[in-house]
Amino acid sequence: MGMLTEFKEFAMRGNVIDLAVGVVIGAAFGKIVTALVEKIIMPPLGLLIGKVDFSQLAWTLSPARIGPDGKEIPAVVIGYGDFINTLIQFVIVAFAIFIVVKAINRLSRKQEAAPAAPAEEVVLLREIRDSLKK
């Protein structure tokens, strides 16, 4: 078997395609969550806290200044507001994944709980056994 044929078989397996679809959907879901957090959740939360724009929260370690050569030296800041936004995004994604996994587990338990119908041979053998008992 040639390497190209083996690669084609590998790439066309269900798991690889499922993974690729999952990655694409995950990337799109990440953008949705980012927009949800930055545009819908954080503005009202910032308003409740006192008209705070979380993306602008930062600790200034060194203010911006003009250097000896006349060029501006930018401020050195720790932007913890973006970290708070990212943390909230993570919590939302983790909760969404938790809900999906919980639903999948519930469905798989229901499928396991349902007994499988006996094979036709078993049904036929039981009928023969029952008729011989009579």
UniProtKB/Swiss-Prot annotation:
InterPro entries: Mechanosensitive_channel_CS (IPR019823), MS_channel (IPR001185), MSC/AndL (IPR037673), MscL_channel (IPR036019). Channel that opens in response to stretch forces in the membrane lipid bilayer. May participate in the regulation of osmotic pressure changes within the cell. Homopentamer. Keywords: Cell inner membrane, Cell membrane, Ion channel, Ion transport, Membrane, Transmembrane, Transmembrane helix, Transport. NCBIfam families: mscL, PRK00567.1-4, PRK13952.1. The chain crosses the membrane at residues 16-36, 81-101. It comes from the Bacteria. One of its GO terms (cellular component) is plasma membrane. This is Large-conductance mechanosensitive channel. It is a multi-pass membrane protein. Its main location: membrane. One of its GO terms (molecular function) is mechanosensitive monoatomic ion channel activity. It is found in: Cell inner membrane. The gene is mscL. Belongs to the MscL family. The keyword Metal-binding does not apply.
